[in-house]
Amino acid sequence: MTGIPLSATFNNIEVPPTEKNLDTFITHFKKLYDKGVRIVTIPHTLWMLTGRFQQAYPDVLVKNTILRNTQRPNEVVKQVEAGFHYINFDRDLMRDEDTLKRMQDAKKYCKDKLGVDVKYSLLANEGCWGNCPVQDEHFLYNNTRSKGNQPTYFQTAISYFSCPKWEEQDPAYHWRIANFPPWKEEWDRLLQYIDVIKMHGRESVSRIFETMDIIDRYRENKEILFRDFESYTQEINFAEKRIKAWREKIKTCKFDCWDCNVCDLITMKNNHVNLIDGVKNALRNAKNEKSKLSKETLYIPGLTSHKVKHFV
């Protein structure tokens, strides 16, 4: 026994919320219940509103699914009224501190008026585009595959026109993704507003290893929890003042990139400075006749001067 409770997840919101399907779910959940499962994710608020699951399994803690995109306090209250004990927020709230603060009022209301000490959870490291315009279509595709051996969304050609294309073409892509900021200090700030940090990895081997590494680094009180971030900023010589401005702005940016542009601005400014520094360095090395130029190329007759060859 590890002492870690097992949670069963049924989050396919494309399954019709019919009474027949509810009957099937209640009947077959007993197999898990009899094995000790006391936590479950249920996809439909309508099922909870009937009260039938709660009547059959009164001691089971029920979570909503993150696929319901819960973003507002009134949604929390209505879901708790329906019977949920644990709310998975939409991941975009990581950049909406104002709403996270307002959610504390809803939490207090649920405890004082409904007698439910509701728990909040926020996904930290899925690595997807913030406020993704095709998120629901991505989940729709995965949840409606008719055969078990059908490829998942990112294994299909059409998926290129979303995240893969944006990552390829947008210089600021990595500053826009819906991950918690990599500093432990920022994770602790967000923990003021939530009870549980939800970690990704169920569908990706590399992501599960990243998740375990983040947990280790948090336990070890490392300043930066994403191992690759520190080396990334050093490699591209990212200025600390720009990172500081970004950290402050994204607390409330809501992923409104069309109106904010902080990710574009810091990337453009940093790339511009690095380009100028690169040119200056190339000119200096050319003057000193330093480069990776081979002797064979250097002494090609009539090509150009040694200085220009080194510069090129």
Where are each of the predicted segments found?
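Active-site pocket-lining/capping segments in soluble small-molecule metabolic enzymes
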Residues: 1-75, 84-312
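Active-site neighborhood of glycoside hydrolase catalytic domains
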Residues: 81
